[in-house]
C-alpha cells in the first residue's frame, strides 16, 4: 500500500501491544488509543424526565410511518443477516431514506426486539474525500458515547478485507428530527424548550470536552423521539483539536448551513474555529424553538450579516475584527449604526430567563459566548441541571486521527475503515491485532445478504412510496442528498442552488492576482466596500459571484460553495 500502508501496519502492531495487559501502563497517557469513555448510567435520563412535570412535558408529535407487512409490499420472506455463524440478527422492514450516498432501511434486531436503522453506504471509496468523512464519523461516534449523541450499534463485517466497496452501519432508530418537530408542534411549552436546550448543551459539553467541534449543528442534525429525547447526529464535518495545537485552529473547508453559522465564519473558507461556533448554532436552534421559524434565514452572506445586525445591532470594532473575510469585515465596518432589538420584543411569549441565556448564546463576539458547561450553570436550568447527569470525558487521542495529517490512498482508507469495523467484532479484532492476514471469510457475509435485501426493497419501492423515502428519519453518515419535494423550504432550495453551482465555483478559483485584476476591471477601479463589492469579493471565500448581472438584486446574486472538494482546491492554490 505504499507509505500509507506502512502507517496503517505500524499503528496496527502498536495497538496490539497497547491492548496487552500491563501493570505499568498509565491511564493518564493521552497519546494512547483510548477506550470508549464511560458515561453516566442510562437510567439517569429516566431520572431527568422525572424532574419535569409530566402533565406539562407531554409527548411531542412526530411523523408516523405505516409499517406494512413485508408480504403486502411484494417482498418475500426477509433474508436475515448472517455474520460468522450468528444468523437471523436483523430483519429488514422497509426503506426509510434514500440519497446519492446510499439507502437507509428500518429493521428489527431479532436478538433484542429493538428497531434499528441500517444505513448502506454505496461505493465508499469512489472518492477519497467521502471515504475520509465516513471514516471520521464512524470513529467519532465510536468514541463519543453519550446519551445525547446518536449511537452506532453495529457495523457489518464485509466479505473481503481488501475488496469491499459498501459499508452497512446499524444505528439506533429515532422517530424524527428537530426540524420536523418544530414544524409539527406549534404548541411547545416552556418546559419543552428548557428540556430540549438542556439536552443539546449537555451533549455539547461532552463533545467539546473531547476537543471535538461539530461545526454543522442545525435542527435537521438533531434527532428526536416522541418522548422528547434528542440526540446530536451527523459528525461528518466535525474536527478534533489536540493539546499540542492552539485552541483556535484553521481548517480549510467550508462548513455549517448558513442560517446557523456564526458571524465570524461568514463568507470565509479559512477561519479560526473555537467551540464558540457550536454555541452560536445552538443559540440559533433555541431561538427557532421559541419562534417556530429560523431566526436568521439569510439568502446569502450579505443578507445574513444584514439580518444579524438588524436584530443584534451593529457590532463593536473589536467584534468586527474577528471576522476572517476581509470584504465582510469592511462591509460591517462601513455599515450604518443600528440599535439592537430588545429580545423581549422579538420573543414576547418567552420566559425572561430563557431570553437572558439566549442573548449570551448568540453574542456577536465569540469571546462573549459561554461554554456549554457555563451555559448549563445558567439560572435558566435551576432545578434541572446536575453535575451527576452531565458527564465529561478526556480529550481524544491524537493517534486516533493521525490519518488526518497524512495523504492516504484508497487502499489506506479502506484498511482504516476495516479497522474501525473490527471494533464491533472483538474476536476478529484480536486476530487482526495479532497480525492475521485473512482476506476473506469462511461464513457467508451479512453484507452479501443485505445487498440482496436492499436491492429488492429498492426495486419494489413504487412511486407512491417516494415521498416517504425522502424523509430523514435516521442517523447521518452522511446526510442524504435527494431531489427536493414540492414542499421544500427556502433553505433547501437555496442549498440546492449552491450544490448545482459547485462546478462553476471550482472553475472560478483563479490565482489571487488574476481574480483581483478581473475584479478591478469589473468595478472600474472603484475601491469602496459596498454590498455589491462584497458580492464580487476576490478573496478565497464563499462569497464568489457566479454570473453577476448589473440588474440582479444583490440578495439573489451571491452563491456560496459548500463542497469540501472545492475547499481542497482552494488550499492547493494557496500552497502553490
Curated annotation (Swiss-Prot):
Top-level EC class as recorded in UniProt: transferase
SMART domains registered for this protein in UniProt: S_TKc
Molecular function GO labels: ATP binding; MAP kinase activity; protein serine kinase activity
Residue numbers of Phosphothreonine PTMs: 252, 257
Catalytic activity, reaction form: L-seryl-[protein] + ATP = O-phospho-L-seryl-[protein] + ADP + H(+); L-threonyl-[protein] + ATP = O-phospho-L-threonyl-[protein] + ADP + H(+)
PTM section of the record: Dually phosphorylated on Thr-252 and Tyr-254, which activates the enzyme.
Region annotation Disordered: where it falls in the sequence: 20-50, 458-535
Compositional bias (Polar residues): 28-42, 504-520
Keyword Hydrolase on entry: no
Family membership: Belongs to the protein kinase superfamily. CMGC Ser/Thr protein kinase family. MAP kinase subfamily.
PANTHER family tied to this protein: MITOGEN-ACTIVATED PROTEIN KINASE
Name assigned to this protein: Mitogen-activated protein kinase 15
